[in-house]
């Protein structure tokens, strides 16, 4: 159902999430796009790209706060978070969507929304939590940034002032062969690119 996610984009914050979702949507098969839009009430996946960030502070979704990142050790090896993390939750959501015939529509709908957001989070270097994650600071043009804050808030706005469509057009440059190779991998495979 979810046929291809292109790994050429970077992204975070609303513009980055929208750009990644747009690139993903452009690479969906027509059948997959139609099925997804059926569950999303006819809306594009871009519409829901930042949804998880919007609901994470509500009582119903507060438990998802740890699900936006992945922890790694000093060697860059993935370390599952006992409270949950992006990788574990993404695997769970994908399994629910793949088993859509045995799930109720609301479960599939919410799982698709989570997948769209988590794929964007997993493309963000600031969402890989190294042991020094909170203490890593750097200065750029006289301003101090934290790693996560820079990637979530500033990386895209300090470079090009593009709309998500422009990022999509500039970054979705994979050849057909590269796209096939990406589609054969799993989200777990793709997440290792940033670790």
Regions found by a protein language model. Give the residues of each.
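Flexible, glycine-rich surface segments
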Residues: 129-187
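Soluble secreted/lumenal catalytic domains
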Residues: 10-149, 158
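Conserved small/polar residues in nucleotide/adenosyl-binding loops
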Residues: 193-195
């Amino acid at each position: 159902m979810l046929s291809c996610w292109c790994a050429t984009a970077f992204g975070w914050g609303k513009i980055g999430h929208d750009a990644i979702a747009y690139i993903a949507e452009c690479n969906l098969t027509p059948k997959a796009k139609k099925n997804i839009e059926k569950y999303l009430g006819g809306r594009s996946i871009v519409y829901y790209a930042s949804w998880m960030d919007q609901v994470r502070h509500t009582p119903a979704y507060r438990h998802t706060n740890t699900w936006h990142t992945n922890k790694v050790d000093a060697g860059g090896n993935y370390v599952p978070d006992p409270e949950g993390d992006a990788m574990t939750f993404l695997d769970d959501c994908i399994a629910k969507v793949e088993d859509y015939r045995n799930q109720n529509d609301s479960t599939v709908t919410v799982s698709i929304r989570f997948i769209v957001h988590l794929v964007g989070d997993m493309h963000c270097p600031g969402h890989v939590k190294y042991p020094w994650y909170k203490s890593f600071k750097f200065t750029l043009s006289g301003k101090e940034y934290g790693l996560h804050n820079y990637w979530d808030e500033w990386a895209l706005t300090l470079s090009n002032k593009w709309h998500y469509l422009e990022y999509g057009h500039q970054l979705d440059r994979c050849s057909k062969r590269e796209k096939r190779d990406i589609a054969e991998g799993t989200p777990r495979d793709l997440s290792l690119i940033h670790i």
